[in-house]
Amino acid sequence: MKIAVAMSGGVDSSVAAALLKEQGHEIIGITMQFFAPSCQGAGTPAHDAAVVAAHLGITHHLLDLEHDFRQLIINDFISQYRSGQTPNPCVRCNRFVKFGLLLDAARERGADLLATGHYARTSIDPDGTRHLRVAANLRKDQTYFLHTLSQERLARVVFPLGDIGSKDEVRDLAHRFGLPVAEKGDSQEVCFIPNDDYVSYLEENCALGGETGDIVHVNGRLLGRHRGTHRYTIGQRKGLGIAWSEPLYVVEIDAARKLVVVGEEPHVYAQGLKAEEVGWIIAPGKEEFEASCKIRYRHQPVACRVTLLQGGACRVLFHEPLKAVTPGQSVVFYQDDEVLGGGRITAAIKRDGEA
């Protein structure tokens, strides 16, 4: 079978390529180029992926997606911050770029499947229904970022690392294969944000500085001024610059009115949330059902009740109040170890009975 591997130059995708080659598949490597061709020196994804491909004796391609990445990912990222939301660009990138444009490019190059270094597992029923399941390595599980995959796309992807129990095992494999990136560190940052400094990136590249406004308490009292709503996210405690008898947290961001609303810790908790752009890998059998959900990547799933609404929306009520429900982030639904689907959080539900 001919399999294209999305090669980032890191350990995970390199081991994925090596494992598939060892299994006897015909492998081609594809590296997505999101930035200028000048960004291809030693240590860059393009360079390191090419070195690994040469080591494995496989063909390596560069896929120029600089324009598409800016239009689909960076511009949306900026727009979401302008509107007072906190986006998750990695979820959107997986949907439109990795398992959209890259998947199509792999097929154009004659590949039967696309493999990535994601930590996730898939399974298939006798009737052909595909399932996305959490990885054996729960600490590295990345299914949160993959909830937008459809049945059609799941049929065309493979995750070779899904059954590997630890990152140490992956590095051991990298050494066994003699990969030149075996000791390369993991990337923890959004790829287009230098040093993970969102504020500097937005102000230096996106003209989001200088839009000052008020910081107000939930009781309406004016507490101070801020230098732009893009500097804040729901649940934030540090960096508010406000003296108060108790710790204060960001409770609401109203970008249109240039308001940052803060309150004591109880005000950060929500009874539920509303979400839009909801999609399902496995369609729910009824309009209301019990599930578990995650509202951020590193959060543990919590029990909830989901109610489907018109227009691809849903309402979610938690069994126990949850802290820092953040518009712009994704809510992802699980049944045991299976991903059902997910959507984009648009609002927190703070009180019982709130629509």
UniProtKB/Swiss-Prot annotation:
It is an enzyme of class 2 (transferase). Signal peptide: none annotated. SUPFAM superfamilies: Adenine nucleotide alpha hydrolases-like (SSF52402). The active site is at C93 (nucleophile), C191 (cysteine persulfide intermediate). One of its GO terms (biological process) is tRNA wobble position uridine thiolation. Keywords: ATP-binding, Cytoplasm, Disulfide bond, Nucleotide-binding, RNA-binding, Transferase, tRNA processing, tRNA-binding. It is found in: Cytoplasm. InterPro entries: MnmA-like, MnmA-like_C, MnmA-like_central, MnmA-like_central_sf, Rossmann-like_a/b/a_fold. It holds the Pfam family tRNA_Me_trans. It catalyses: S-sulfanyl-L-cysteinyl-[protein] + uridine(34) in tRNA + AH2 + ATP = 2-thiouridine(34) in tRNA + L-cysteinyl-[protein] + A + AMP + diphosphate + H(+). Its main location: cytoplasm. The record marks H118, Q329 as: Interaction with tRNA. Disulfide bonds join C93-C191. ATP binds at A6, M7, S8, G9, G10, V11, D12, S13, M32, G117. Belongs to the MnmA/TRMU family. Catalyzes the 2-thiolation of uridine at the wobble position (U34) of tRNA, leading to the formation of s(2)U34. This is tRNA-specific 2-thiouridylase MnmA. The lineage of its organism: Bacteria, Pseudomonadati, Thermodesulfobacteriota, Desulfuromonadia, Desulfuromonadales.
